[in-house]
Amino acid sequence: MYKRLKILPIVILLVSCKRTDTFPYYPVFLEFNITAIAPELKASGGYKEFTAPLNYSQRVGLGGILVFHSIEDKFFAFDMACPNEQRANIKLHCNNMGIAVCDSCGSQFLVSDGLGFVLKGQAKIPLQKYNVYYSAYLDNLVVRN
């Protein structure tokens, strides 16, 4: 009887303690004209890192916003904070291959496919993805969550 009473609290602790692997919510709203603000996004494979809002009404998430132009002529946007680190001062950096790399933990993420999955490293969850709306007529891009 006493042995069961000793085991019960341990079992309860093991079952109730559950780590959540989610990215914290931060507001995101970024709107800009590609020709004026980010001409590097005109070409497929181009990317732009926004680490600060362009004006007072815009928000760039936790670590900033990475916008990538895929070879399928689609735009994808991700938070630049590494999901493993989840700190604003540790940012991912993209390369022309469509891979974002965290300098702190070494995790690598594939952004060119629009999913942000982990390629290698310590990270367990993909990048935080944001919705992208593109107006070809106005050449404007809107990123929001």
Identify the function of each model-found stretch:
Residues N96-G106, G116-Y130:
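Short cysteine/histidine-rich metal-coordination sites, predominantly Zn2+-binding motifs
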Residues M1-C17:
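Sec-dependent bacterial lipoprotein signal peptides
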Residues K18-N95, L110-D113, Q128-N145:
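N-terminal pre-ligand scaffold of iron-sulfur
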